[in-house]
Amino acid sequence: MRVADFSFDLPDELIARYPMAQRNASRLLTLDGNSGALGDKQFTDLLGMINPGDLMVFNNTRVIPARMFGQKASGGKLEILVERMLDDKRILAHVRSSKSPKVDSLILLDGGYQMKMVARHDTLFELELLSELTILEVLEAVGHMPLPPYIDRPDEDADKERYQTVYNQNPGAVAAPTAGLHFDDAMLDALKAKGVNIAFVTLHVGAGTFQPVRVDTILEHKMHSEWANVPQDVVDLIAQTKAAGKRVVAVGTTSVRSLESAARASQGELKAFSGDTDIFIYPGYQFQVVDAMVTNFHLPESTLIMLVSAFAGFDHVMAAYQHAIAQKYRFFSYGDAMFVTKKAH
């Protein structure tokens, strides 16, 4: 398949630049992967679609304030976007400046902190913090929330809370697992009260999630890698859920990729997994774990719309997107959601 097959025209006014006042006030488009049938719902209607005994799997990564501003010792301004934390002092980062910093050069951050350019790895820079503090502490002090480029506004104080799930736990993402943004504590409590089981995996979403696919055919694309963790207790819960004939419902493409990565790493049999994954899911992929998913609307030609197309069928998904545009759903990170069931292979 060609990357251009996943293109669609989106009116600019359908890109959500701010979240809804209430987390669960978004709309929900349902898509039956087998029939292609669509339903226009409210997000709170999801409660009626998840059955007792079903297992919902969430990504509990925490978005770090990954964007920092500063200048080179020579005086030129620069912007740093953390791609991943290597340890307490070192990061891999994208650096935007008129000229790339040289090895061993100093970078002066806002707030008086200093970093040293240690090495270059393709398009990424390895930077070391020269401070008693940890990278996380400095980011919390001077970092900005790394809103996606299409939101096209400076970050605001409200984004510190709203570009973060209510159940976030493990710091390391530079983009939110956005399907989870729709859930508030009351909705999670209502799901549990109904007998729905809840589990958490971790995948630290990298900035690569926003990188355009720069090749013509899908098979040429090289996925960026991200760190994921699927613990043993989640593996056990999934086995119990499947044995009882119930569904595994992944909240977000990052949860899907975590679970399917764990299955891929052990040749289809699900085992605990911790490490880097570069899994690329596109039409033709056979899903091993996930039966249904909650997901937002994704960018044209992105690897994420390819994943959803693999799950529910290419024609069904592209038709659903045209319906969403006609019905003026809100798109991307702060936008509305879909509930999608898997197409049988």
Curated annotation (Swiss-Prot):
Q: Name one GO molecular function term.
A: S-adenosylmethionine:tRNA ribosyltransferase-isomerase activity
Under InterPro entries, the record lists: QueA, QueA_dom1, QueA_dom2, QueA_sf
Q: What is its EC number?
A: 2.4.99.17
Ligase found in the keyword field: no
Question: Which pathway does the UniProt entry assign to this protein?
Answer: tRNA modification; tRNA-queuosine biosynthesis
The compartments listed are: Cytoplasm
**A UniProt-annotated Pfam family:** Queuosine_synth
The reply to whether Transferase figures as a keyword in the UniProt entry is yes
The entry's cellular-component GO terms read: cytoplasm
Which reactions appear under catalytic activity for this entry? 7-aminomethyl-7-carbaguanosine(34) in tRNA + S-adenosyl-L-methionine = epoxyqueuosine(34) in tRNA + adenine + L-methionine + 2 H(+)
Example GO BP: queuosine biosynthetic process
**Alphabetized UniProt keyword annotations:** Cytoplasm, Queuosine biosynthesis, S-adenosyl-L-methionine, Transferase
Family the entry assigns = Belongs to the QueA family.
Q: Briefly, what is this protein's role?
A: Transfers and isomerizes the ribose moiety from AdoMet to the 7-aminomethyl group of 7-deazaguanine (preQ1-tRNA) to give epoxyqueuosine (oQ-tRNA).
Q: How does it assemble?
A: Monomer.
From the Swiss-Prot or TrEMBL record, give the protein name. Answer: S-adenosylmethionine:tRNA ribosyltransferase-isomerase
**Organism per entry:** Shewanella baltica (strain OS185)
Gene name, please? queA
